[in-house]
Amino acid sequence: MARVSLIKEGERPELSDLIGTIRAERGGRFPNLYRALLNSPSVAEGWLKFFTAVRQKAKLHGRYRELAILRVALLNGADYEYRAHVPFALQEGVTQAQIDALPGWQVSAKFDDRERAVLAYTDCVTREIRAPDPIFAELRRHFDDRELVELTATVAGYNLVSRFLEAMQIDHEK
């Protein structure tokens, strides 16, 4: 059960425009994550803008974004984040076999060199904050500066998401 109130639609009329924007940016959905964030409208608004940029306005292919997000969720034990992003990962071309192999990606043949570079970087940034030069050099072989910034923002951002969800004990929608 969430540690803060989950704002219901219509409960606070002054939030109706922001809720409409959330629904528009999130495919008509009003997730529990945003219902919790709306306890601080300015945080909810900034969060929405940042994650819309990361997910919908980035050059980085969604396949790599979603692999990184799922890996962050696994490393942080963030069930909500993981469950929410499996469908997006599948839509972006990640296979179910790859999703199943993510816990032990290092020994799996399901990932190509680019995907392995993304996962190694995600592991380092999530666990240690800094990635060693050889890990970053391998990543740089596959991605340009814009994509590197977007991937790093994705990994850092979804570490924020998982920590927020777990600290606030937000449950996934039923």
Residue ranges and their predicted role:
Residues 1-174:
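Hydrophobic alpha-helical segments
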